[in-house]
Amino acid sequence: MNGQNIRIRLKAFDHRILDTSTKEIVSTAKRTGAHVRGPIPLPTKIEKFTVNRSPHVDKKSREQFEIRTHKRVLDIVDPTPQTVDALMKLDLAAGVDVEIKL
């Protein structure tokens, strides 16, 4: 697979799970002989939701909630067939969303 790159985008709400997953991917790729660029942290997406505290009155009394989506990008340069097989067999944490582009 010469001249080809694999780009892996990881998303998670918890940054600790995300970091452990990126470390697993990097160690697996390096063990099989591929060159890894990253992990590159992307900007955290913060979604804020504002709701009324009471169900009926008191419009001025509100509460805010937020969801933070943390993202990382990894580039695997010139992956070997063993690298692709190892990445397919890799079992990551449940809260991590993985997008792979060849």
Swiss-Prot record:
Cited InterPro entries: Ribosomal_uS10 (IPR001848), Ribosomal_uS10_CS (IPR018268), Ribosomal_uS10_dom (IPR027486), Ribosomal_uS10_dom_sf (IPR036838)
Going by the UniProt record, its keywords in alphabetical order are: Ribonucleoprotein, Ribosomal protein
| Gene Ontology BP annotations | translation
Kindly give the Pfam families that the UniProt entry links to this protein.
Answer: Ribosomal_S10
Please indicate if the UniProt record lists Ribonucleoprotein as a keyword. Answer: yes
Annotated GO MF terms: structural constituent of ribosome; tRNA binding
Please provide one cellular component term from the Gene Ontology annotations of this protein.
ribosome
Similarity section: Belongs to the universal ribosomal protein uS10 family.
Describe its assembly: Part of the 30S ribosomal subunit.
HAMAP family attached to this UniProt entry? Ribosomal_uS10
- Primary role: Involved in the binding of tRNA to the ribosomes.
Q: What is this protein called?
A: Small ribosomal subunit protein uS10
